[in-house]
């Protein structure tokens, strides 16, 4: 079970010059909505508050879900909101050689898995019945010792340590100390999917390392993924960024607001006043920022120091 502890006050002064790169990493599955705007705003504000660079990376590695033209719409919406990125936008589909190289580096820790989703689900159900509900969250290791006769390799999985258990911990700037036993709570996880696409965990770690990402600000729905990414960073010899996971926007049913749960695009070509009233100001309020403004420049001039104050109040700057 992912555990969180009370935030620890920062006792070391950080050199602001070291905070260089923070990414915003949208999926091109549709236009931006309020939930994705909150994540974009938090990462943008954090970059500006620390005098760093804000990078945009289109995470289009999941080809089946990509929507034609969505990446251009996302970039245009960011600019209309006054969020201009530094450097060139990158696309994951242009970086597959980096993922190939990382997989080669992990060769001794990766094995082929021939399990279908149904087979994994059935195994997890049996384990849950024997050992309790938490067992259903862990890959049962069916193919760890080799493919059974007649099985065809589908996905590639990364071995996690068996004994002793491997507990990965980190200090999240928003949530405090977070720990996860990836051996017993996750198990061996996929780095290349059965459909041939690269798994999110591997692609994002490789890209963060290649781009020199120092700080990651994103939604709390990805908090559970972070220990796996830290483990991959260890194996690949990559530095660990700082992490800050902001709350996610929920719909009326208590589900994460997303394209799959009916989130509506906020940028429909309306003017700046509508963007402020229906997108930027609500996103800022959701993040806990008391900001008022009647223009984009005024909004950002107020939002950046408000973000600094919020983080200092939380001992998270």
Explain the meaning of each model-derived region.
Residues 2-128, 220-238, 293-298:
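N-terminal Rossmann-like or analogous alpha/beta NTP/dinucleotide-binding catalytic cores
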Residues 16-19, 24, 170, 189, ...:
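Phenylalanine-focused residue identity feature
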Residues 70-75, 79-178, 185, 296-317:
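Active-site neighborhoods of enzyme catalytic cores
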Residues 116, 224-225, 235-317:
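Catalytic adenosine-cofactor/nucleotide-binding cores of aminoacyl-tRNA synthetases and other
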Residues 119-270:
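Active-site cores that bind ATP or allylic diphosphates and position pyrophosphate for catalysis
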